[in-house]
A protein has these predicted regions:
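Active-site catalytic loop in hydrolytic enzyme cores
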Residues: 20-112
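Acidic Ser/Thr/Pro-rich low-complexity disordered segments
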Residues: 38-55, 163-176, 188
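CN hydrolase (nitrilase-like) catalytic-core segments centered on the catalytic cysteine
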Residues: 1-18, 23-24, 101-187
Length: 188
């Protein structure tokens, strides 16, 4: 939160599971941090946090939750929201956490409504996400940005340009590559 305010940038970050021991539920969430003077020349001293949830657990999450306490099992608490974040002149952003990127219904809702889709991921199957990103960029006609954990690599930014050599804006391919990248995305 402090870093987002210091650099005056909207920041998305994955966080650990929320475990509700009373309800025996597990939630997978991310946070969006918006500094109070974002997109101005003023220095930000505080920020607002919004929690964004995940609808579909991955198979690995299902197994982890199942084995967590077999005598008194936990369940995954789904967040059915499909987020569209209005960032003003920078366009509207559809936000997705990991396995929700496989949810085709989401793209029908986002088509014509967003200029960007941002996916926070902890994904070993990076080739599937790469293939889906190209298809989604062309079907939804928006930029697709995948921010994968550095351990598995393959973060990328893909845009639906007509000329194929322009489509891949950024790709960090390979395991154990930790990086921060600033890129320009088209907004139409």
């Amino acid at each position: 939160r402090k870093l987002a305010s210091e650099i005056n940038a909207v920041t998305f970050a994955g966080i650990d599971w929320f475990v509700d021991s009373y309800r025996r539920e597990v939630k997978n969430k991310a946070i969006m941090i918006v500094p109070n003077h974002w997109n101005t020349s003023l220095k930000s001293y505080s920020s607002n946090i919004t929690y964004l949830g995940k609808n579909n657990p991955s198979n690995g999450e299902k197994m982890t939750i199942f084995h967590f306490d077999k005598t008194n099992p936990y369940t995954f608490s789904s967040d059915d929201n499909m987020y569209i974040i209005d960032s003003g002149e920078f366009g509207k952003i559809g936000f997705i956490i990991c396995a929700d990127f496989y949810d085709i219904e989401r793209f029908v809702i986002y088509k014509g409504r967003v200029q960007h889709i941002i996916i926070l991921a902890l994904n070993k199957d990076t080739n599937s996400f790469f293939a889906i990103s190209e298809a989604v960029a062309r079907l939804v006609m928006c930029n697709v940005v995948i921010c994968n954990i550095g351990q598995f690599g393959d973060s990328l930014a893909y845009s639906p340009y007509k000329k194929d050599y322009k489509r891949m804006i950024y790709r960090n391919q390979g395991a154990n590559l930790f990086s921060t990248q600033v890129i320009d995305l088209p907004v139409k």
